Amino acid sequence: MSATDTARAKELLASLVSMPDATIDDFRALYEQVCATFELPDDAQVEPVDANGADALWVSAPGVSADTVAVVVHGGGFTMGSAHGYRELGYRLSKSGNLRALVVDYRLAPESPFPAPVDDVVAAYRYARSLDGVENVFLVGDSAGGGIAMSALITLRDAGEQLPDAAVVLSPLVDLAGESPSLVDRAHLDPLPAAVLVNGMGGLYLNGLDVRHPVASPMHGDLTGLPATLVLVGTDEGLHDDSTRLVDKLKAADVEVQLEIGEGLPHIWPIFSFHPDAVAATDRIGEFLRSHVAAPR
């Protein structure tokens, strides 16, 4: 673990809450500034696409398999973030997983609260599944995007559709009731006020729905029958227990699940491309996804 790189990652996270009286537009601009620090390699292939009505970007490294797709759901507290800002993560996932990344530019709250973001992710997943030659489709999300990804899995299962071959969630926000003890116990370690993320931005996303809504707040839903899932979380984040509680609930539902904990690492640490542990995490994710393709390559 690089202490310097970890400090830099925490500084970038802290910058998101550095502006007093920030508006939603301010937060969105700040998040794009953070994502702009992740340099996209020159050989990245990026192409916009209409994925069954959902805006998205195809992001690929050269020479990757065309038969495998990872639908990527960016983070941003339900209210910010973009596919453009997550091109670099999409590229790393493409390279490590030997796949094409379909990064979804889902609609954001408060303009488009639940279920709009989930609907967009489901639409993009269906689009990926419908493509000729595609045999494997995965779902990957971080933070609020991890929660949206879990909601999409529940939605697809309830609709009786073919599920993703596996899922990966990074520091997922899955309990909008804010019942994870780490929101308080680990607050001093986290540069982000995670409780504000849950209560404030989560409230905009719910738009009056119950904080224990079984789809919008997946920790309070039925997780039986979901695909194999890899969960990554850092020790230094308020949402730590959202991940550990999710893993426990998935195990109780007889879902294949693996947990990776980054010691001393902050919220959504795998997105910070300059950090050696983030690069290692991407390699681990790629290994996990490759182990769940229909015909291992």
Swiss-Prot record:
InterPro entries documented for this protein: AB_hydrolase_3 (IPR013094), AB_hydrolase_fold (IPR029058), GDXG_lipolytic_enzyme (IPR050300)
Biological source species: Rhodococcus erythropolis
Entry keyword annotation includes Membrane: no
Function of the molecule: Lactone hydrolase that is required for the degradation of monocyclic monoterpenes such as menthol and carvone. Catalyzes the ring opening of lactones formed during degradation of monocyclic monoterpenes. Can hydrolyze epsilon-caprolactone, the lactone derivatives of dihydrocarvone (4R)-4-isopropenyl-7-methyl-2-oxo-oxepanone and (6R)-6-isopropenyl-3-methyl-2-oxo-oxepanone, and ethyl caproate.
Catalytic function, reaction form: 4-isopropenyl-7-methyloxepan-2-one + H2O = 6-hydroxy-3-isopropenylheptanoate + H(+); 7-isopropyl-4-methyloxepan-2-one + H2O = 6-hydroxy-3,7-dimethyloctanoate + H(+)
Any Pfam family matching the protein: Abhydrolase_3
Signal sequence bounds: none
Alphabetical keyword list: Hydrolase
Name of this chain's protein: Monoterpene epsilon-lactone hydrolase
pH sensitivity of activity: Optimum pH is 9.5.
Lineage: Bacteria, Bacillati, Actinomycetota, Actinomycetes, Mycobacteriales
